[in-house]
A protein has these predicted regions:
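Amphipathic alpha-helical segments of tetratricopeptide repeats
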Residues: 43-54, 94-102, 106, 135-141, ...
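Tetratricopeptide repeat
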Residues: 38, 44-48, 90-97, 117, ...
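Flexible inter-repeat linkers and adjacent short helices
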Residues: 1-93, 97-114, 134, 138-141, ...
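Bacterial C-terminal helix-turn-helix
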Residues: 417-509
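TPR/TPR-like alpha-solenoid signature
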Residues: 16, 20-23, 61, 68, ...
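Residue register of alpha-helical TPR repeats
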Residues: 20, 58, 65, 112, ...
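Residue signature of alpha-solenoid helical repeat architecture, marking inter-repeat boundaries
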Residues: 16, 61, 66-68, 88, ...
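Short coil/turn connectors between adjacent alpha-helices in alpha-solenoid helical repeat scaffolds
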Residues: 27-40, 74-90, 119-129, 159-168, ...
Length: 509
């Protein structure tokens, strides 16, 4: 980085020229994954993440370029910073620059800024908004260059994130010629990497080997381009994804080797979010190896890291992995809580495909789900995944449907879920301790009364308490149980005067 700064001579530049040159260099360093370099180059204009750049004395058009650049950098750097509000800051800066470009009628710059804004929304999991913005940008970005390629890649990433793999594949393959002729090695690498990710998700039992081999070939092309771009962070992404493919091929030892190298690279870059992603993959490999304790520990740590960042889609993914590990360890309640958190996190940011996968996985992994929760989970999963083009997901949905039918047949009754909003049955809700204690108390007493055929005397004996204490609890705290006990029969004076054996003494109030 010192070499870069030493070569950066600004003595012959005006303030406006220097600002534009710093922005240009910062974006080049971004493509290399050089966080420190970016901040060093931008320092005179931008002091720190979350702060507004200093545009004093700059021409309005140059100030807009600075705002756009800092917005792009903030969006990018937030992938390794523990700042939940980073994306909001990025959106505000980019939007401000966009408004300036609109005011001077520069439609190309408006489209470019809108494309970068779309990336911010994608990072937050707002897939519908991101898709719309990318599509609107591409209408204006007609020139075959890096800017159009970046917008096309963003659209493909959104479709992949939404599990619309065939659409993502078409977007990438239809524009292969453009990505072949662009000058950015970083963009070329990202193109081949995304194509590999799509091919992997479109693998079916009949084409699995072919698709996975094609994916590995694309990853090799991606690694080559990222090496030319001198970007170790993106190379780590490639190695993480190759590790995932090796897991699918049951080559676990090789998978761990790739993942260790990926984690080393992200560690050098101090990119905590990407490190958590790699730990998610490591946990999945451990699960495949049936090393569930190791998987749970690694996934739990990844959840802890992502909870502190704004990467909700990534958090939802890792929560699902953590839920699987907990379920395999027979910790059903903790597993259900993890799955329900994944559903809630994904649902809140509009990543409905991820919410659907979480609900589907909960059905698959937990045998003791209530009929209501099971039905609600399937109802939501089937709706949220209705546009998915993954053959694997369709097979899993069919298996889940059979499980729901079997549960209904066994229980002999239909689930009592409100049709208008079945999601409530599968979300974690705040717990009122006093209410829950009363509910549990009522359940225990009801069972005792049922076993005692409504006899308060015998129920009290079963519960190791006095008749008077049980009667008081029912009358004061559990009035709904009054109908469960035998009717109170008052004794006449004659009956009271004649001693009787305990078996002959009727229930008293």
């Amino acid at each position: 980085m010192k070499i870069t700064l030493r070569k950066f001579d600004t003595s012959h530049l005006t303030a406006n020229e220097e600002a534009l040159r710093r922005c240009e260099m910062a974006l080049e360093l971004k493509d290399r994954g050089d966080y420190a370099g970016v901040q060093g180059v931008m320092h005179p204009l931008w002091d720190a993440m979350g702060e507004r750049p200093n545009c004093t004395g700059l021409h309005a058009s140059v100030a807009a370029e600075v705002l756009l650049t800092v917005g792009i950098l903030t969006c990018w750097i937030s992938t390794q910073c523990q700042l939940k509000k980073a994306q909001e800051t990025a959106k505000n800066l980019i939007t401000e620059s966009l408004h300036f470009f609109e005011s001077i009628g520069d439609l190309k710059k408006v489209a470019a800024a809108r494309s970068e804004l779309a990336y911010c929304y994608w990072c937050e999991g707002e897939l519908n908004e991101a898709r719309t913005m990318f599509e609107e940008s591409l209408v204006k970005l007609t020139t075959e260059g890096n800017t159009r390629a970046r917008a096309l890649l963003g659209l493909a990433v959104v479709e992949w994130s939404a599990s619309r793999y065939a659409i993502a594949l078409k977007c990438l393959t239809d524009n292969a010629a453009l990505f072949n002729k662009i000058t950015s090695y970083a963009l070329k690498g990202a193109y081949h990497s995304q194509l590999a990710m799509v091919l992997r998700m479109l693998a079916t039992p009949s084409n699995k080997n072919d698709n996975l081999q094609r994916a590995v070939a694309e990853y090799q092309k991606a690694d080559h381009n990222f090496k030319l771009a001198r970007n170790p962070v993106f190379r780590a992404d490639v190695k993480n994804n190759v590790g995932n493919i090796l897991r699918q091929l049951s080559r676990y030892k090789e998978a761990h080797k790739y993942l260790q190298e990926a984690k080393r690279l992200t560690g050098l870059a101090k990119d905590k979010a990407r490190t958590a992603q790699i730990d998610d993959t490591r946990a999945q490999v451990f699960i495949a190896e049936k090393k569930f304790k190791e998987a749970e520990a690694v996934a739990r740590n990844a959840v802890r890291i992502l909870e502190k960042s704004g990467h909700q889609c990534l958090l939802a993914d890792v929560l699902v992995t953590h839920g699987i590990a907990l379920a395999r360890l027979k910790r059903a309640e903790s597993a259900q809580f993890a799955f329900q958190r994944a559903i809630e996190v994904a649902h809140q940011v509009g990543a409905l495909n991820k919410a659907g996968i979480a609900a589907l996985t909960m059905i698959e992994e937990l045998e003791e789900l209530s009929s209501d929760a099971l039905y609600a989970a399937y109802d939501r999963a089937s709706e949220w995944l209705t546009t998915s083009q993954s053959q694997d997901l369709l097979i899993r949905l069919n298996a889940a449907a059979r499980k729901v039918v079997a549960k209904v047949r066994t229980s002999g009754s239909l689930p009592q879920v409100v049709a208008e909003d079945p999601i409530d049955a599968i979300l974690n809700k705040p717990c009122d301790l006093q209410r829950e204690v009363l509910k549990y108390e009522g359940t225990v007493i009801q069972r005792a009364l049922a076993k005692a055929n409504g006899s308060l005397t015998r129920a009290a004996a079963m519960l190791s308490m006095s008749y008077q204490a049980l009667a008081y609890i029912i009358e004061s705290r559990q009035p709904d149980l009054l109908k469960e006990r035998t009717p109170i029969r008052r004794r006449s004076r004659r009956e009271s005067a004649v001693p009787k054996s305990p078996e002959q003494i009727p229930e008293q109030s």
